A protein has these predicted regions:
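N-terminal pre-catalytic segment of deacetylase/amide-hydrolase enzymes
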Residues: 2-119, 151, 282-283, 290-303
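Active-site beta->alpha N-cap acidic-glycine motif
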Residues: 67-163, 168-174, 178-179, 196-200, ...
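Structural recognition of the beta-strand scaffold that forms the well-ordered cores
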Residues: 97-101, 135-139, 161-164, 208-212, ...
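Acidic-and-aromatic substrate-binding clefts and catalytic sites of carbohydrate-active enzymes
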Residues: 107, 115-116, 139-148, 211-218, ...
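Charged helix-capping and loop-helix junction motifs
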Residues: 119, 247-251, 278-281
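An active-site-proximal "capping" alpha-helix that borders the catalytic cofactor pocket
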Residues: 184-201
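His/Asp/Glu-enriched short active-site or ligand-binding loop at hydrolase and phosphoryl-transfer sites
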Residues: 217, 221-257, 292-301
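Catalytic grooves of carbohydrate-active enzymes
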Residues: 259-298
Length: 303
């Protein structure tokens, strides 16, 4: 197995994406962004994708809460017990697609929020509800602490499920677009701290899925999270919504990339992804016109 870092952007886009990913999360930018990261460690991804488990048994106490509607499906560990990686449904005949949204906020952005910067996007959540689009929100623990009422509202709405995007939005391997890096023990604790923040906010619909900040990971990162009993979730469609100014371009990029079983990465952060809500209003009706049904990640993993 290789221990090389999988990045979220093609090499040509790295310089442009650095600033976006440092403050926003994986998947922004060029149409090919994310291709290398999504591959993960080949053996871990390939093996885990062929074996699923219908239980999150063994998850730590701070992990997905009792009271969620049902136990969400998880993937079996990869070789040597590595955390499994999911990026697209194995069942690719059904025209299903999962829109996922990273609710990003780093551990040091509190002062910026206090000064009026908006890391939330209530209009986006409202639009998803109005359009009746089941969605998975990959939330940082720091975001849940900053916006506890919104975290609770999202996390008690059956239209949504909340997945873990770390507490701090620090990198789980280095280099990763300038993000501060956590070592193995700190990385594992960071995941638990995020689940605890969701619970503190009153979110119930939490699921044992994890998205690496910046989308960057390697074997060591997968090993560090193995005891958390989570499934790492990447994507196969990059929206390019981070710091985008043209919602039409974002929508076209998504529409061009979606295939049956796709996972689309977008963002739920006004300051870093200001046109996402408008793009969603274009994406949803067009995909429905093409015969697609929107589902949460848990449904894709369960197929």
């Amino acid at each position: 197995m290789t221990n090389s870092v999988r990045k979220v952007a093609a090499a040509a886009a790295t310089a442009v994406l650095g600033a976006a990913l440092a403050g926003c999360g994986g998947g922004a930018g060029a149409p090919d962004a994310g291709r290398e990261a999504r591959m993960g460690t080949p053996a871990a991804s390939a093996s885990a994708s062929t074996s699923t488990s219908a239980s999150a048994a063994g998850a730590p106490a701070a992990s997905p809460q009792a009271g969620a509607p049902a136990k969400p499906p998880t993937m079996a560990p990869g070789p040597n017990g590595l955390t499994p990686v999911f990026e697209r449904a194995k069942q690719r005949t059904d025209k299903t697609v999962a829109l996922t949204f990273d609710a990003d906020m780093t551990s040091d952005q509190g002062p910026r929020a206090a000064d009026g910067e908006h890391f939330d996007n209530p209009a986006l959540i409202s639009t998803l509800r109005t359009l009746k689009v089941p969605s998975t929100i990959f939330m940082t623990g720091r975001w849940a602490e900053e916006y506890p009422d919104q975290a609770k509202s999202i996390g008690t709405d059956p239209n949504f499920e909340i997945a873990n995007h770390s507490y701090s939005h620090h990198a789980f391997t280095s280099p990763c677009y300038g993000l501060p890096a956590l070592d193995g023990a700190a990385a594992r604790a960071d995941v638990d701290r995020a689940f605890a923040a969701f619970k503190q906010a009153g979110a119930v619909n939490t699921v044992p899925y994890f998205r690496f900040p910046g989308g960057c990971y390697d074997d060591q990162a997968l090993r560090a999270l193995s005891t958390a009993k989570v499934t790492a979730v990447q994507w196969d469609v990059v929206s390019g919504d981070a710091f985008a100014k043209d919602p039409v371009a974002v929508a076209e990029q998504v529409l061009d990339g979606v295939k049956p079983g796709s996972v689309v990465v977008m963002h739920c952060t006004r300051s870093a992804a200001p046109v996402t809500e408008e793009a969603v209003r274009r994406i949803v009706p067009e995909l429905r016109k093409r015969g697609y049904r929107f589902v949460k990640v848990s449904e894709l993993i369960g197929k």
